[in-house]
Amino acid sequence: MPRYAFRIEYDGHPFKGWQRQTDLPSVQGAVEAALAKLEADVPTIAAAGRTDTGVHALGQVAHADMQRDWDPFRLAEALNYHLKPAPVAITACARAHDDFHARFSATWRSYTYRMICRRAPLVHARGHAWAVRGTLDVTAMAEGARHLIGKHDFTTFRATHCQALSPIKTMDEIRVEEVSLPAGTEIRFHLKAQSFLHNQVRSIVGSLEHVGSGAWAPDDMRRALEACDRAECGTVAPPDGLYMTGVGYDEDPFADGWKDT
């Protein structure tokens, strides 16, 4: 059966996460329902990462084995038609190698977290960013984030029910970006690693908010990391501001396929 790779964008707000769940809306369920409109034997779709309830994606990658050969453009068009009105879109599609696996072939994953600092409530970004009242020290947050670069035990920054066999992860990049808005300031946290623990990004961002507000010193991020104790984590940031932005592979699975431009 021919295997196809998909790049998927979605608004996580109406879904109970990526993973299919009985009687609950999920992104996987929405995509598989669209696939069911195209082939009698509904393909199972596997993703690079299982995002949680309310988490969004700009560059989720998934694959599925189809019953027949499809032109990638026509397959993407058909899926996007049947996905409506769900806030899910296929933005790239390609015929993949038979041994390609969206999750296990991935060499890195990237996430961006959006935080908007202002007194007024969010309107257009409501449900798509963390609203923080007051100002934050971006320089201090960037200094605190540097303590997390490299290979560490991230027990402090993972959920207590995380199922990963090991808390050891290598953080390749944490970058803090400040963007001026007409009303307020947006702070974006860009993180990149081969893989992440459950709630790792949200735990890190919530702790960095403590640094930005002055409740923690930048060095407190190192202290919390070295404690290897979940109780030493700061606030866990809400899911609203988290976006899965990309997945990397040794070979671009979409190099010879269709990509929206």
Swiss-Prot record:
Disulfide-bond pairs as recorded: none
Residues at the catalytic site: D52 (nucleophile)
EC number: 5.4.99.12
Gene Ontology molecular function, alphabetical: RNA binding; tRNA pseudouridine(38-40) synthase activity
Gene Ontology biological-process annotations: tRNA pseudouridine synthesis
Source domain of life: Bacteria
Catalyses which reaction(s): uridine(38/39/40) in tRNA = pseudouridine(38/39/40) in tRNA
Positions bound to substrate: Y111
Entry keywords, A to Z: Isomerase, tRNA processing
HAMAP family: TruA
Described purpose of this protein according to its UniProt entry: Formation of pseudouridine at positions 38, 39 and 40 in the anticodon stem and loop of transfer RNAs.
Recorded family membership: Belongs to the tRNA pseudouridine synthase TruA family.
Subunit-structure text: Homodimer.
Protein name from the UniProt record: tRNA pseudouridine synthase A
Name of the gene this protein is made from: truA
